[in-house]
Amino acid sequence: MLPRAEQKQQTRLALMDAARHLMECGRGFGSLSLREVAKTAGIVPTGFYRHFADMDQLGLVLVSEVGQTFRATIRLVRHNEFMMGGIIDASVRIFLDVVAANRSQFLFLAREQYGGCLAVRQAIGALREDITSDLAADLTLMPKLQHLDADGLHVMADLIVKSVFATLPDIIDPPAHALP
């Protein structure tokens, strides 16, 4: 038998997996009910409250999770670009592979950045700003961009990050033509 803390963590992860599973079946986070998430996770609805105060808190934890994955991906890309002298094609491949490996997380991110839950939208907006700031700092290290000031680099980073976020739906469910 598992220790209580480990069992609690497994149930918490089961609730997160259940929410992602329901969203992979075509549902938006805002349309999920606490009862159906709990049922899908195999627990009674009142058990949900041992792990999350409400559905908004579950959504915020899901944003945090995809944020960690996204930022770890950016670190891989950064390592490829700066440490290994990588090329853009390789960096794009790294990103696409991570999105494919974590499809449910990125599906959540793609859908909920404009979804119905205000707290989740705000958390995703903050994540996008953090990623933009990280990228702007990285861009200062690129010799080809030395002529740009901090504001110019931030605008460039903002455009790149917003483009990536906007194209997530096509990356997750590509149109008929194949991705690189």
PLM regions with names:
Residues 1-10, 149:
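N-terminal intrinsically disordered/low-complexity leader segments
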Residues 7-19, 37, 62-70:
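Generic hydrophobic, amphipathic alpha-helix propensity
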Residues 14, 25-57, 61:
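Helix-turn-helix
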Residues 52, 111-116:
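Short helix-capping/turn signature of helix-turn-helix
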Residues 59-66, 109, 131:
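Alpha-helical DNA-contacting segments of helix-turn-helix folds
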Residues 75-101, 157-160:
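Hydrophobic alpha-helical connector segments
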Residues 98-101, 137, 157-179:
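Amphipathic C-terminal alpha-helical segment
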Residues 118-144, 154-161, 165-166:
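Amphipathic alpha-helical packing segments from all-alpha helical-bundle domains
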